[in-house]
Structures are given as structure tokens and as C-alpha cells.
Amino acid sequence: FNDRIRTLQVFAGCDPLSMPVAVLGDPEGITMEFDHLADDREYFRYSLEYCDARWQPSGLVDSEFLDGFNEGTVDDYAFSEATSTHYVHYSLKIPNEQIQLKLSGNYLLKVYPESEPDSIVLQCRFMVSEQTAPVHITASPITNIDYMAAHQQLEIAIDTEGAMVEDPFNDL
């Protein structure tokens, strides 16, 4: 982080209390917001990196995981009003007119000043899921009385009919 960046929030859709997990193809997507302690607007740009399950760079080229250009401007901003500390509040939604995601998985979002592309001021992680195998969960009363006070009994069914599952122990 740059020490002038504050109040970073990353969340699904419009709910700031939600986890940063979006559904592939959902126009609500991910929202990223932050405050920049400054008197005037600074021009920020962003780029995305597709990561593997351990958040390491995947090595995929941009066209394999997104449609559009893997660079855009953070254009949504508002100046602070009636505060003792001056700041500019920035907001970005993904997907947007510049970037459409093609793959589910882990993404790293990097934000940097337009004039200094090598000087990243913040980066944040978000995930995109794909609903290929619906999961049905039901809670039922516990059958073992010894565990009743501290445990729950769940029945979980995964519908893999439409999904390609070769190794259920690792793929689910």
C-alpha cells in the first residue's frame, strides 16, 4: 500500500459486507473502493492478473481470461466534503465496459498512478466462481445426543450431472 491510500474495500455487487466473490457472467461483479488522501484528483489506472489456487501468477495471457484490454482507468471518484482531512474517494466495478472476465478463479487487481505504471499503490484479491455443480444442503436434527449441544448434522448433495468431474476427491 501507498501510505496515502486508506479505507480499501472489495466486495461482491453493491453489498460492502459481502465477501469479494462474484459469479462468472453476473453483471453485478466485484466493487473495489478506496480513499486517497489528497486535495485533488490523481489519475489512476488498473490491471488484472489471473492467479492459480495458491495466488501465484498463472502464466495465462490476457486473452485467455478476459475480453477487452487488461488496463483501464479508475474514473468514478468523489471529493470529500466537510471533513478535516481532504481525500478523494474512488470506486471501480468489474466487469465493466473495458474488461469482461472469461474464467472463474482467483484475480489480483493492481492500481497505479497513470504517470507511474511501475509504482503500484494498492493491490487486492477477489474470486470469481462458476455455478457448474449445484450444491444442496439440508440441516437435520442430530441423531447422537452426545453431540447435540456443540454440533450440527448436515446432508450435502452435489449435482455433478452437468459438470465434468474426473476425480471427485480433488475436483469437488
Question: Regions from the language model: what does each represent?
Answer:
Residues 44, 88, 103, 122, ...:
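Residues that flank catalytic or metal-binding motifs in active/ligand-binding sites
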Residues 15-19, 31, 73-78, 91-95, ...:
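Short structured motifs
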